[in-house]
Protein backbone atom coordinates (compact mmCIF):
# COMPACT_ATOMS: atom_id res chain seq x y z
CA UNK A 1 0.00 0.00 0.00
CA UNK A 2 1.16 3.50 -0.61
CA UNK A 3 3.18 5.48 1.84
CA UNK A 4 1.77 8.98 1.94
CA UNK A 5 5.24 10.25 1.13
CA UNK A 6 5.02 8.79 -2.34
CA UNK A 7 3.54 11.12 -4.87
CA UNK A 8 5.51 14.05 -6.16
CA UNK A 9 7.77 16.18 -4.00
CA UNK A 10 5.99 15.47 -0.78
CA UNK A 11 5.60 11.79 -1.55
CA UNK A 12 8.94 10.13 -2.11
CA UNK A 13 8.94 6.57 -0.99
CA UNK A 14 5.45 5.39 -1.64
CA UNK A 15 3.19 2.74 -2.20
CA UNK A 16 2.90 -0.87 -1.98
CA UNK A 17 3.19 -0.71 1.73
CA UNK A 18 0.28 -3.06 2.14
CA UNK A 19 2.08 -5.47 -0.11
CA UNK A 20 4.93 -5.64 2.34
CA UNK A 21 3.29 -7.48 5.24
CA UNK A 22 4.33 -11.08 5.55
CA UNK A 23 1.60 -13.43 4.47
CA UNK A 24 0.21 -14.09 7.92
CA UNK A 25 -3.42 -15.08 7.73
CA UNK A 26 -4.80 -14.58 11.21
CA UNK A 27 -8.40 -15.28 12.12
CA UNK A 28 -9.25 -13.15 15.12
CA UNK A 29 -12.31 -14.07 17.12
CA UNK A 30 -11.98 -11.29 19.66
CA UNK A 31 -11.02 -7.65 19.40
CA UNK A 32 -7.34 -7.06 20.06
CA UNK A 33 -4.72 -4.37 19.48
CA UNK A 34 -2.30 -5.03 16.62
CA UNK A 35 1.02 -3.19 16.50
CA UNK A 36 3.04 -5.25 13.99
CA UNK A 37 2.42 -5.75 10.26
CA UNK A 38 0.03 -8.53 9.28
CA UNK A 39 -2.88 -9.50 7.04
CA UNK A 40 -5.72 -11.91 7.67
CA UNK A 41 -9.47 -12.30 8.06
CA UNK A 42 -11.72 -11.05 10.83
CA UNK A 43 -15.47 -11.53 11.19
CA UNK A 44 -15.89 -12.26 7.50
CA UNK A 45 -13.67 -9.43 6.22
CA UNK A 46 -10.14 -9.33 4.88
CA UNK A 47 -7.88 -6.92 6.77
CA UNK A 48 -4.40 -5.55 6.28
CA UNK A 49 -2.14 -3.60 8.63
CA UNK A 50 1.35 -2.35 7.79
CA UNK A 51 3.71 -0.09 9.71
CA UNK A 52 7.32 0.90 9.08
CA UNK A 53 7.95 0.55 12.82
CA UNK A 54 8.61 4.24 13.51
CA UNK A 55 6.39 6.30 15.74
CA UNK A 56 3.44 4.74 17.53
CA UNK A 57 0.40 3.12 15.92
CA UNK A 58 -2.20 0.69 17.26
CA UNK A 59 -4.83 -1.00 15.06
CA UNK A 60 -7.86 -2.98 16.27
CA UNK A 61 -10.43 -5.12 14.45
CA UNK A 62 -14.03 -4.84 15.62
CA UNK A 63 -17.32 -6.52 14.82
CA UNK A 64 -18.10 -7.19 11.15
CA UNK A 65 -16.46 -4.45 9.05
CA UNK A 66 -15.47 -2.18 11.94
CA UNK A 67 -11.88 -1.22 12.74
CA UNK A 68 -10.06 1.54 14.60
CA UNK A 69 -6.57 3.01 14.67
CA UNK A 70 -4.70 5.54 16.79
CA UNK A 71 -1.32 6.92 15.76
CA UNK A 72 1.42 9.40 16.65
CA UNK A 73 3.98 9.20 13.85
CA UNK A 74 5.61 12.62 13.78
CA UNK A 75 9.09 11.09 13.90
CA UNK A 76 9.03 9.46 10.46
CA UNK A 77 6.29 6.93 11.13
CA UNK A 78 4.26 5.51 8.27
CA UNK A 79 1.33 3.07 8.37
CA UNK A 80 -1.66 1.83 6.43
CA UNK A 81 -4.57 -0.32 7.57
CA UNK A 82 -8.15 -1.29 6.86
CA UNK A 83 -10.82 -3.89 6.15
CA UNK A 84 -12.49 -5.11 2.97
CA UNK A 85 -12.34 -8.03 0.55
CA UNK A 86 -9.90 -10.27 -1.26
CA UNK A 87 -10.47 -10.30 -4.14
CA UNK A 88 -12.26 -7.01 -4.68
CA UNK A 89 -14.66 -6.18 -7.49
CA UNK A 90 -16.87 -3.45 -8.91
CA UNK A 91 -19.33 -2.98 -6.05
CA UNK A 92 -21.05 -0.29 -4.03
CA UNK A 93 -19.07 0.21 -0.80
CA UNK A 94 -20.65 1.93 2.20
CA UNK A 95 -18.58 3.36 5.03
CA UNK A 96 -19.13 5.45 8.15
CA UNK A 97 -17.28 6.62 11.22
CA UNK A 98 -14.82 9.25 12.39
CA UNK A 99 -11.56 10.23 10.72
CA UNK A 100 -9.56 12.80 12.70
CA UNK A 101 -6.04 13.35 11.35
CA UNK A 102 -3.53 15.95 12.43
CA UNK A 103 -1.24 16.21 9.43
CA UNK A 104 -0.84 13.96 6.40
CA UNK A 105 -3.38 11.10 6.23
CA UNK A 106 -5.82 9.46 3.80
CA UNK A 107 -9.23 7.77 3.98
CA UNK A 108 -9.87 5.86 0.76
CA UNK A 109 -11.18 2.84 -1.08
CA UNK A 110 -7.88 1.20 -1.93
CA UNK A 111 -6.92 -1.84 -3.98
CA UNK A 112 -4.67 -3.62 -6.43
CA UNK A 113 -5.12 -5.45 -9.72
CA UNK A 114 -2.77 -7.64 -11.74
CA UNK A 115 -2.46 -7.96 -15.51
CA UNK A 116 -1.90 -5.00 -15.57
CA UNK A 117 -0.40 -4.34 -12.15
CA UNK A 118 -2.26 -1.28 -10.86
CA UNK A 119 -2.61 0.34 -7.45
CA UNK A 120 -5.77 2.45 -7.11
CA UNK A 121 -7.30 4.95 -4.73
CA UNK A 122 -10.76 6.45 -4.48
CA UNK A 123 -9.83 9.13 -1.97
CA UNK A 124 -12.79 10.26 0.14
CA UNK A 125 -10.99 12.34 2.79
CA UNK A 126 -7.47 13.51 3.55
CA UNK A 127 -5.55 15.63 6.03
CA UNK A 128 -3.13 18.46 5.35
CA UNK A 129 -1.86 17.38 1.92
CA UNK A 130 -3.72 16.72 -1.34
CA UNK A 131 -1.68 14.08 -3.21
CA UNK A 132 -3.05 15.26 -6.55
CA UNK A 133 -0.58 18.14 -6.38
CA UNK A 134 2.19 15.81 -7.49
CA UNK A 135 0.40 13.79 -10.19
CA UNK A 136 -0.89 14.09 -13.76
CA UNK A 137 -4.50 15.27 -13.95
CA UNK A 138 -6.40 13.42 -16.68
CA UNK A 139 -10.06 14.32 -16.13
CA UNK A 140 -13.02 14.68 -13.79
CA UNK A 141 -15.91 12.51 -12.69
CA UNK A 142 -19.20 13.28 -10.93
CA UNK A 143 -20.37 10.47 -8.66
CA UNK A 144 -22.09 9.97 -5.32
CA UNK A 145 -22.81 13.65 -4.74
CA UNK A 146 -19.45 15.20 -5.62
CA UNK A 147 -16.94 15.87 -8.36
CA UNK A 148 -13.74 13.84 -8.33
CA UNK A 149 -10.45 14.76 -9.98
CA UNK A 150 -8.85 11.82 -11.80
CA UNK A 151 -5.08 11.42 -11.72
CA UNK A 152 -2.51 8.96 -13.01
CA UNK A 153 0.97 8.45 -11.60
CA UNK A 154 3.74 5.96 -12.38
CA UNK A 155 5.68 4.34 -9.55
CA UNK A 156 9.19 3.25 -10.56
CA UNK A 157 10.86 0.36 -8.73
CA UNK A 158 8.54 0.57 -5.75
CA UNK A 159 7.09 -2.14 -3.47
CA UNK A 160 3.96 -3.86 -4.78
CA UNK A 161 1.92 -6.99 -4.22
CA UNK A 162 4.28 -8.86 -6.57
CA UNK A 163 7.52 -7.39 -5.22
CA UNK A 164 9.51 -4.36 -6.31
CA UNK A 165 8.04 -3.24 -9.64
CA UNK A 166 7.19 -0.32 -11.89
CA UNK A 167 3.43 0.19 -12.09
CA UNK A 168 0.70 2.80 -12.49
CA UNK A 169 -1.45 4.34 -9.79
CA UNK A 170 -5.00 5.48 -10.60
CA UNK A 171 -6.60 8.07 -8.34
CA UNK A 172 -10.03 9.65 -7.95
CA UNK A 173 -9.86 12.48 -5.37
CA UNK A 174 -13.17 13.73 -4.01
CA UNK A 175 -13.59 17.51 -3.86
CA UNK A 176 -16.22 17.49 -1.10
CA UNK A 177 -14.40 15.49 1.55
CA UNK A 178 -16.42 13.12 3.74
CA UNK A 179 -16.03 10.35 6.31
CA UNK A 180 -19.32 8.55 5.65
CA UNK A 181 -21.22 7.59 2.51
CA UNK A 182 -21.36 5.10 -0.35
CA UNK A 183 -18.84 4.78 -3.17
CA UNK A 184 -20.07 3.43 -6.52
CA UNK A 185 -16.76 1.91 -7.57
CA UNK A 186 -17.99 1.00 -11.08
CA UNK A 187 -18.34 4.70 -11.88
CA UNK A 188 -14.67 5.23 -11.12
CA UNK A 189 -13.48 2.09 -12.90
CA UNK A 190 -15.47 3.11 -15.98
CA UNK A 191 -14.24 6.71 -15.92
CA UNK A 192 -10.65 5.50 -15.62
CA UNK A 193 -11.17 3.13 -18.56
CA UNK A 194 -12.48 6.02 -20.68
CA UNK A 195 -9.05 7.64 -20.22
CA UNK A 196 -7.21 4.44 -21.16
CA UNK A 197 -6.58 3.57 -17.50
CA UNK A 198 -7.62 -0.08 -17.51
CA UNK A 199 -7.69 -2.37 -14.50
CA UNK A 200 -6.72 -6.03 -14.47
CA UNK A 201 -7.84 -8.93 -12.27
CA UNK A 202 -8.74 -7.72 -8.80
CA UNK A 203 -6.58 -8.50 -5.79
CA UNK A 204 -7.57 -7.10 -2.38
CA UNK A 205 -9.84 -4.06 -1.92
CA UNK A 206 -10.25 -2.29 1.43
CA UNK A 207 -11.45 0.85 3.15
CA UNK A 208 -8.03 2.19 4.09
CA UNK A 209 -6.70 4.65 6.67
CA UNK A 210 -3.11 5.78 6.13
CA UNK A 211 -0.90 8.21 8.02
CA UNK A 212 2.57 9.58 7.32
CA UNK A 213 4.54 11.69 9.82
CA UNK A 214 1.29 12.73 11.48
CA UNK A 215 -0.98 11.88 14.38
CA UNK A 216 -4.66 11.18 14.75
CA UNK A 217 -7.36 8.58 15.18
CA UNK A 218 -10.04 6.86 13.13
CA UNK A 219 -12.91 4.49 13.85
CA UNK A 220 -14.56 3.22 10.67
CA UNK A 221 -17.05 0.60 9.52
CA UNK A 222 -17.21 -0.72 5.96
CA UNK A 223 -19.82 -2.89 4.23
CA UNK A 224 -20.68 -3.98 0.71
CA UNK A 225 -23.72 -3.00 -1.28
CA UNK A 226 -24.75 -4.68 -4.50
CA UNK A 227 -22.38 -5.16 -7.39
CA UNK A 228 -22.33 -1.86 -9.25
CA UNK A 229 -24.45 -1.51 -12.37
CA UNK A 230 -26.81 1.03 -13.79
CA UNK A 231 -29.68 1.62 -16.12
CA UNK A 232 -33.14 0.15 -16.12
CA UNK A 233 -36.26 0.39 -18.21
CA UNK A 234 -38.73 -1.65 -20.16
CA UNK A 235 -40.19 -1.56 -23.63
CA UNK A 236 -41.89 -3.60 -26.28
CA UNK A 237 -42.20 -3.35 -30.02
CA UNK A 238 -42.87 -5.35 -33.13
CA UNK A 239 -42.26 -5.03 -36.82
CA UNK A 240 -43.41 -6.86 -39.91
CA UNK A 241 -42.81 -6.77 -43.62
CA UNK A 242 -44.04 -8.51 -46.71
CA UNK A 243 -41.99 -10.53 -49.15
CA UNK A 244 -38.73 -12.31 -48.39
CA UNK A 245 -37.09 -9.61 -46.31
CA UNK A 246 -36.26 -9.60 -42.62
CA UNK A 247 -37.27 -7.76 -39.48
CA UNK A 248 -35.02 -5.64 -37.30
CA UNK A 249 -35.34 -4.13 -33.83
CA UNK A 250 -33.91 -1.30 -31.82
CA UNK A 251 -34.21 -1.35 -28.02
CA UNK A 252 -33.24 1.39 -25.60
CA UNK A 253 -33.76 1.78 -21.84
CA UNK A 254 -37.43 2.50 -21.39
CA UNK A 255 -38.57 2.07 -25.02
CA UNK A 256 -38.07 -0.01 -28.12
CA UNK A 257 -39.14 -0.01 -31.75
CA UNK A 258 -39.21 -2.71 -34.37
CA UNK A 259 -39.19 -2.41 -38.15
CA UNK A 260 -39.49 -4.92 -40.94
CA UNK A 261 -37.96 -4.57 -44.38
CA UNK A 262 -37.91 -6.56 -47.59
CA UNK A 263 -40.22 -7.67 -50.36
CA UNK A 264 -41.13 -11.03 -48.92
CA UNK A 265 -42.52 -11.86 -45.50
CA UNK A 266 -40.59 -11.15 -42.34
CA UNK A 267 -41.10 -9.90 -38.87
CA UNK A 268 -39.10 -8.50 -35.99
CA UNK A 269 -40.01 -7.83 -32.40
CA UNK A 270 -38.54 -5.50 -29.82
CA UNK A 271 -38.01 -6.93 -26.35
CA UNK A 272 -37.53 -5.61 -22.90
CA UNK A 273 -34.84 -3.01 -22.25
CA UNK A 274 -35.09 -3.40 -18.49
CA UNK A 275 -32.36 -4.41 -16.08
CA UNK A 276 -29.55 -3.57 -18.48
CA UNK A 277 -26.39 -1.79 -17.35
CA UNK A 278 -25.94 1.84 -18.30
CA UNK A 279 -23.04 3.03 -20.44
CA UNK A 280 -19.75 2.52 -18.52
CA UNK A 281 -21.49 0.06 -16.15
CA UNK A 282 -20.31 -3.51 -15.52
CA UNK A 283 -22.00 -6.13 -17.70
CA UNK A 284 -20.01 -9.29 -17.12
CA UNK A 285 -17.00 -11.08 -15.71
CA UNK A 286 -16.25 -14.21 -13.70
CA UNK A 287 -18.50 -14.29 -10.64
CA UNK A 288 -20.67 -11.42 -11.92
CA UNK A 289 -24.37 -11.82 -11.06
CA UNK A 290 -25.65 -8.49 -12.38
CA UNK A 291 -27.01 -7.47 -15.79
CA UNK A 292 -25.27 -8.80 -18.88
CA UNK A 293 -26.88 -6.47 -21.42
CA UNK A 294 -26.26 -2.78 -22.09
CA UNK A 295 -28.91 -0.06 -22.34
CA UNK A 296 -26.31 1.93 -24.29
CA UNK A 297 -23.15 0.75 -25.99
CA UNK A 298 -21.78 -2.78 -26.28
CA UNK A 299 -20.63 -5.14 -23.53
CA UNK A 300 -16.87 -5.62 -23.98
CA UNK A 301 -14.55 -7.74 -21.84
CA UNK A 302 -11.54 -6.00 -20.26
CA UNK A 303 -10.38 -9.25 -18.64
CA UNK A 304 -11.86 -12.46 -17.24
CA UNK A 305 -13.17 -10.59 -14.18
CA UNK A 306 -14.61 -7.43 -15.70
CA UNK A 307 -16.68 -6.47 -18.74
CA UNK A 308 -18.32 -3.08 -19.21
CA UNK A 309 -20.69 -1.23 -21.52
CA UNK A 310 -18.61 0.90 -23.90
UniProtKB/Swiss-Prot annotation:
Signal peptide (from-to): 1-19
Reaction(s) catalysed by this chain's protein: Endohydrolysis of (1->4)-beta-D-xylosidic linkages in xylans
Summary of pH dependence: Optimum pH is 5.0.
Biased composition (Low complexity): 218-227, 247-256
PROSITE patterns, per database record: CBM1_1, CBM1_2, GH11_1, GH11_2, GH11_3
Main location: secreted
Record's compositionally biased regions (Gly residues): 228-246, 257-274
KW Protein biosynthesis (keyword) present: no
Molecular function terms from GO: cellulose binding; endo-1,4-beta-xylanase activity
Protein name from the UniProt record: Endo-1,4-beta-xylanase B
